[in-house]
């Protein structure tokens, strides 16, 4: 996921990340149907990329986006839920990252990680992003720049 995006605000930037990781999951799914000898190695590399992208994205949300949103909106239960969802994602990511080679559970773990991610993205799009955009105390354009800067550091 590129650090610079054409999005106008923090929500647009985060959603661009969502779209990019969705594409990675789709690419992985296509590889699961491949009978090519190189498919296993490609799946492992793609899974590692997915894990990196999700780890950086979650860290950005937890360090920058969620704290700013927590100060700007009254209903913070959604933020608590989002952080719990991040922990579930991290648990699966940790399991995938310790694998030197895909085993019989590897594809299932990547698939479930994708499903968890899709659920999380849907909640952000339908609940968190509208609340963020409605919050008067939140400068989403400035927050976007903060996210871009932090992401560049994390991806370096």
Features from the language model and the residues they span:
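Small-residue-biased structural context
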Residues: 1-156
């Amino acid at each position: 996921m590129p650090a610079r995006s054409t999005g106008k605000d923090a929500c647009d930037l985060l959603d661009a990340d969502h779209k990019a990781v969705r594409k990675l999951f789709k690419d992985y799914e296509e590889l699961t149907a491949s009978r090519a000898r190189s498919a296993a190695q490609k799946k492992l590399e793609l899974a590692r990329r997915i894990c990196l992208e999700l780890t950086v994205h979650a860290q950005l949300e937890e360090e920058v986006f969620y704290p700013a949103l927590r100060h700007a909106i009254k209903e913070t239960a959604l933020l608590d839920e989002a952080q719990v969802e991040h922990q579930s994602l991290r648990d699966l990511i940790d399991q995938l990252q310790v694998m030197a080679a895909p085993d019989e559970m590897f594809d299932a773990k990547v698939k479930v990680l994708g499903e968890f991610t899709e659920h999380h993205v849907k909640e952000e799009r339908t609940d968190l992003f509208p609340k963020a955009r409605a919050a008067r105390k939140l400068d989403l354009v400035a927050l976007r720049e903060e996210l871009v800067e932090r992401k560049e550091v994390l991806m370096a």
